[in-house]
A protein has these predicted regions:
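Exported/periplasmic cell-wall-interacting domains
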Residues: 151-264
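Short polybasic amphipathic segments
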Residues: 7, 106-111, 232-234
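Gly/Pro-biased beta-strand-loop elements
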Residues: 86-194
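Extracellular adhesion/carbohydrate-binding repeat motifs centered on closely spaced tryptophans
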Residues: 1-95, 163-164
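Short strand-connecting beta-turns/loops that link adjacent beta-strands
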Residues: 45-46, 104, 226
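A short, sequence-level motif marking secondary-structure junctions
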Residues: 11-12, 21, 33-34, 54-56, ...
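A residue-level signal for beta-strand positions that form part of recognition/binding surfaces
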Residues: 5, 27, 49, 70, ...
């Protein structure tokens, strides 16, 4: 009808409305009025994302530049928000990498540079804790440096103020006394001494300048920095990034280990 596309059920001859349907090998999304939706994202269950191109076809098993960024979709059309697991470390490391630290949103997004040299391929988003207002994580452009499997991070945190030393796993230096690292532990090398309150505070500001992460995310940065000097950009923005801000599943107060730590 005009420029709008509709589809009639072969069984009932009724117009398909408010659902996705496969037509001639392609999936299309028909809106509430039955009109095919074009050039638009579709969200499902609050997490899965799909994209329908200008012809209304769901993107599957491909990559495509949409707006500023290049996105990857699997065979089922689901947007891939972890290219390390989808494409592998070697593929990711074949590109120059940038770690964007958004202080406003307490969110990190890792980007890979495309053939044009622009960091426009989002690789993974991570929830984090940046420095507090009194001891902020410095803004600016830096790069990853030394890495440490475990490291003494000094004394005092907002969850342990007796001055005792705390420690971090998968520690990556990027500027001055600032590091990416796991949430803190009270015993060096013992991953069952986690400061649970600090873990549950991820997504909010409050560190002494370092950037705290879930163990699995700190490990990713550690592994990348072991093989490439990654660019680090610390900035402020109300835009969480192309993958948004990841949600944190909090742990009970008695749990003394990071649930993302495969060695715990």
């Amino acid at each position: 009808i005009g420029k709008n596309k509709y589809y009639m059920s072969k069984k009932s001859y009724a117009r398909i409305e408010n659902k996705t349907t496969t037509v001639s090998g392609h999936k299309y999304w028909f809106g509430k009025t039955g009109k095919v939706i074009t050039s638009k994202w579709k969200y499902k269950n609050g997490s899965r994302r799909y994209y329908f191109d200008k012809k209304g076809r769901m993107l599957t098993n491909t990559s495509k530049k949409i707006g500023k960024y290049v996105y990857f979709f699997n065979k089922n059309g689901v947007l891939q928000r972890n290219l390390i697991s989808y494409k592998g470390y070697n593929w990711v490391l074949s590109h120059p990498l940038k770690i964007g630290v958004n202080r406003t949103k307490n969110t990190i997004t890792i980007y890979a540079a495309g053939s044009d040299g622009k960091y426009n391929i989002p690789v993974k988003a991570m929830i984090c804790t940046v420095g507090s207002a009194s001891r902020p994580t410095d803004k600016g452009t830096f790069s990853t440096g030394y890495i440490y499997r475990w490291k003494d991070l000094g004394g005092r945190t907002e969850y342990q103020d007796n001055g005792d030393v705390v420690y971090g796993q998968y520690v990556t230096h990027f500027y001055g006394a600032m590091y990416f690292h796991s949430v803190c532990y009270t015993v060096n090398g013992n991953n069952h001494t986690l400061l649970t309150g600090a873990y549950n505070w991820l997504g909010n500001s409050g560190s002494h300048g370092c950037v705290r992460l879930k163990c699995s995310d700190a490990k990713i940065i550690y592994n990348l920095a072991a093989r490439q000097r990654c660019k680090v950009v610390v900035y402020d923005s109300n835009y969480a990034g192309p993958f948004g801000k990841p949600k944190l599943k909090k742990i009970p107060s008695w749990q003394n280990y990071d649930p993302t730590d495969t060695n715990a």
